[in-house]
């Protein structure tokens, strides 16, 4: 099957208005219920996800209701040559986490991890 495109991309949308009760500021609790965004960053809870993604300029969704399998918080433009392959939702193999995270950022959150290891060859 072809990878999802645009609005059909992985993850679920969040109704962030329920957390934005004061009009401009979010009133988030310190309650720990980690969620993983389609930007492959772990947020401490859904409200913090809303607060920190509101100004990203593109729709970050929640990929899963726990910590990310692959964390892209600290990624670099300069990647090493290490080989720890990851399979992206676009069906492409990425040689390592750094290259995968750069592709995630370039896709504006549309790309997500399909599985650890190489994608199956057709």
Swiss-Prot record:
Keyword Secreted: yes
Gene Ontology CC: extracellular region
Subcellular compartments: Secreted
Pfam families (UniProt xref): Kazal_1 (PF00050)
Residues with site note (Reactive bond 1 for trypsin): 30-31
Residues of the Kazal-like domain: 10-70, 71-121
Main location: secreted
Taxonomy, superkingdom: Eukaryota
GO MF entry, a single one: serine-type endopeptidase inhibitor activity
CDD domains xrefs: KAZAL_FS (cd00104)
Keywords, sorted A to Z: Disulfide bond, Protease inhibitor, Repeat, Secreted, Serine protease inhibitor
Site, Reactive bond 2 for elastase: residue positions: 81-82
Cystines in this chain: 16-50, 28-47, 36-68, 72-101, 79-98, 87-119
Function: This inhibitor is composed of two homologous actively inhibiting halves: one which inhibits trypsin, the other which inhibits elastase.
Protein name, entry field: Double-headed protease inhibitor, submandibular gland
């Amino acid at each position: 099957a072809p990878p999802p495109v645009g609005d059909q991309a992985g993850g679920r949308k969040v109704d962030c208005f329920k957390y934005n009760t004061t009009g401009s500021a979010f009133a988030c609790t310190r309650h720990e219920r980690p969620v993983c965004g389609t930007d492959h960053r772990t947020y401490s809870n859904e409200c913090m996800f809303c607060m920190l993604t509101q100004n990203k300029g593109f729709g970050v969704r929640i990929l899963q209701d726990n910590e990310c399998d692959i964390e892209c918080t600290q990624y670099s433009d300069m990647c090493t040559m290490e080989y720890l392959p990851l399979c992206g939702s676009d069906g492409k193999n990425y040689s390592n986490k750094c290259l995968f995270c750069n592709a995630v950022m370039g896709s504006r959150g549309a790309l997500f991890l399909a599985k650890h290891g190489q994608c199956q060859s057709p």
